[in-house]
Regions:
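Non-catalytic, surface beta->alpha helical segment in thiol-disulfide oxidoreductase systems
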Residues: 67-95
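A short beta-strand-turn-helix
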Residues: 1-7
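Aromatic-flanked redox-active Cys/Sec active sites in thiol-based oxidoreductases
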Residues: 9-15
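Cys/His/Pro-rich metal-binding microdomains
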Residues: 16-19, 72
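Thiol-based oxidoreductase modules, predominantly thioredoxin-like and allied folds used
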Residues: 10, 33-52
Length: 95
């Protein structure tokens, strides 16, 4: 997947909700063969900057905040936020 066509998962190292999403993300990848790139934003200014770059779409999906877990589709520019189901993750990835 090209650099501008990624499925991105913004997470925080100590984020309980992010840890709970890991099995869903792994199941998504196993079932679809699509990779979700995880970017940890609480301890990486570089990754946090990437997240801020997509801030408008993420804030819209997250009720006005840049929270984690958040998922951004670089191809469609769509975001989903929080604890999402496998079905919602698949729909987001398809656009």
């Amino acid at each position: 997947m090209s650099e501008n066509n990624r499925l991105i998962w913004f997470s925080g190292r100590e984020c309980v909700h992010c840890k709970r999403m890991r099995p869903t993300v792994e199941q998504f990848q196993a079932e679809t063969g699509k990779k979700i790139t995880e970017l940890e934003v609480w301890h990486s200014e570089e990754n946090a900057s990437v997240m801020r770059g997509y801030g408008d779409a993420i804030k819209k999906a997250c009720g006005g905040d840049l929270g984690v877990p958040a998922f951004f589709n670089e191809k469609t520019k769509n975001a989903v936020c929080g604890m999402v189901t496998l079905e919602k993750l698949k729909a987001w990835a398809e656009g």
